[in-house]
Amino acid sequence: MLDLGAGTGLLAGLVARRFPSAHVTLIDISEEMLARARERFAGRQDVVIVATDYSAAEFTGQFDVIASALSIHHLEDDEKRSLFRRILAALSPGGVFVNADDVLVPSGRLQQLYEAEWVRQVSELGVTVDQLAAARERQKHDRLAPLADQLRWLEEAGFIDVDCYYKYLTFSVFGGRRPLG
């Protein structure tokens, strides 16, 4: 498995726990986040941790699974399209790509509804006004793209069985598979 934008290794850790024989490669640009991933995977010989910018990196090897969680939305649209092509090339035949990420809402009305629901939910969790403001400030750096566009870009890159597997408000899990032939 290749985990793009792996951060502290949370997603890769869940996969490694569920599939103990899996070989896992984590890529992230943040040395600070990867330091926590190194702690998480201390003593594991089958885990490779690489500090690099995956948006421009060429991936070596073939992977059965490539996944990313809450990272690709930081890329511009043309970078997403390029990344999807490179992901396809790095997958083994029949391999799958899964992206769990925020997407752009297709209408202003839905955006208002989703925003109100998000604020309600995080407020119930005890998020303070300052924390909410900080989250909104971080979101200014996001480069969200509509889900429909990203599904189309996956198909254009050559993925098959492209679909959205889960969606709640702006959060979606989607991906596709590399053809066998």
Task: Describe the predicted segments one by one.
Residues 2, 8-56:
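Class I SAM-dependent methyltransferase SAM/SAH-binding core
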Residues 18, 73-75:
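A short His-aromatic
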Residues 59-66:
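A short acidic, Gly/Pro-enriched loop at the edge of an enzyme's catalytic core
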Residues 68-72, 100:
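Residues lining the SAM
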Residues 81-93:
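A short glycine-rich, Lys/Arg-flanked "PGG" loop and its adjoining helix->strand segment in the class I
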Residues 100-156:
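C-terminal alpha-helical "lid/dimerization" subdomain adjacent to the S-adenosyl-L-methionine
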Residues 160-181:
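Core SAM-dependent methyltransferase catalytic element
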